[in-house]
């Protein structure tokens, strides 16, 4: 059980409903500090969060997850001045726009990876950090394909691949930073917008989604926090239709098995090099 009491949480999000609802739940967990980085200012939402727990310090930055990593570094240098350290990083920025593939990939995948690459050195135990937890909020169509939202699905598949790769003991045993993902099912906020299919053949289905039964953002946010509290390194969760379940992961091609002779060190020098101790 991961105890959020006293933790310093950094949430990189868009201005959607899941981020706000997740933050509301986090504020009930006696966290010490909450940094919110999102694309749009929302003072009423910040005030609402603060009213839940007055003793929790909340900081806000207007943030574009698609910015260059060099610019991100400047932001997070400032974040660290206020936060001192980060225990939990939540990546929740998302975009579903099949007409704009670049923006979809940059927001959902490239931006998330750049954020992780920027924040990890602050958390890495071998670089003066205290370890911690990275939570990548993704989608159920990052587990199985979507014939309607092809670009969105591809970006979310990438999040799962990145999460599982970064959670490998090769890194975790060194930096002490666990990595997990929560795959959210559709919410009413998601389907209650103009959705465009990747190809015109799928548009009828995209239009019908508006009438589909979906979970509320409040329930989804609660289950994201539930997943965090039950987290283990490398774990993938599904938060859909009001429920939460762990994904049974399967290896089809495991690098350590396929390249067993390469992956096993032959002497101490190779061991130090492979484990990233140089």
Curated annotation (Swiss-Prot):
Q: Which residues form the active site?
A: 152
Q: Which family does it belong to?
A: Belongs to the short-chain dehydrogenases/reductases (SDR) family.
Q: Which species is listed as the source?
A: Drosophila persimilis
Q: Which Gene3D superfamilies match?
A: NAD(P)-binding Rossmann-like Domain (3.40.50.720)
A Pfam entry, by short name: adh_short
Q: Where does NAD(+) bind?
A: 11-34
Keywords, alphabetical: Oxidoreductase
PROSITE patterns for this protein: ADH_SHORT
Listed result of changing residue 200 to E = In strain: Persimi42 and Persimi50
Q: Name one GO cellular component term.
A: cytoplasm
InterPro entries found in the cross-reference section: ADH-rel, NAD(P)-bd_dom_sf, Sc_DH/Rdtase_CS, SDR_fam
Question: Which GO MF term does the entry hold, naming one?
Answer: oxidoreductase activity
Q: Tell me the protein's name.
A: Alcohol dehydrogenase-related 31 kDa protein
- Cite the SUPFAM superfamilies for this sequence: NAD(P)-binding Rossmann-fold domains
Where along this sequence does the record place binding of substrate? 139
């Amino acid at each position: 059980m991961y105890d959020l009491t006293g933790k310093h949480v950094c949430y990189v999000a868009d201005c959607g409903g899941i981020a706000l609802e997740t933050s509301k739940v986090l504020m009930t967990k006696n966290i010490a500090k909450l940094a919110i980085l999102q694309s749009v200012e929302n003072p009423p939402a910040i005030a609402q969060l603060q009213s839940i727990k007055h003793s929790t310090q909340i900081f806000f930055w207007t943030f574009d997850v698609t910015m260059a990593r060099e610019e991100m570094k400047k932001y997070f240098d400032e974040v660290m001045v206020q936060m001192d350290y980060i225990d939990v990083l939540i990546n929740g920025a998302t975009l579903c726009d099949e007409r704009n593939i670049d923006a979809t990939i940059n927001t959902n995948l490239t931006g998330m990876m750049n954020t992780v690459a920027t924040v990890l050195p602050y958390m890495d135990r071998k670089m003066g950090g205290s370890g911690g937890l990275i939570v990548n909020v993704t989608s159920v169509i990052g587990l199985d394909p979507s014939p309607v939202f092809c670009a969105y699905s591809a970006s979310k598949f990438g999040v799962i691949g990145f999460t599982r790769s970064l959670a490998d003991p090769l890194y975790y045993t060194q930096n002490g930073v666990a990595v997990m993902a929560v795959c959210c099912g559709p919410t009413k906020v998601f389907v209650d917008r103009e959705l465009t299919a990747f190809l015109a053949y799928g548009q009828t289905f995209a239009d019908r989604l508006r009438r589909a039964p979906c979970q509320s953002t409040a329930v989804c946010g609660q289950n994201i926090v539930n997943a965090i509290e039950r987290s283990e390194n490398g774990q993938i969760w599904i938060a859909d239709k009001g429920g939460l379940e762990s994904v049974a992961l399967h290896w089809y091609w495991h690098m350590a098995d396929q390249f067993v002779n390469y992956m096993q060190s032959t002497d101490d020098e190779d061991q130090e090099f492979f484990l990233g101790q140089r």
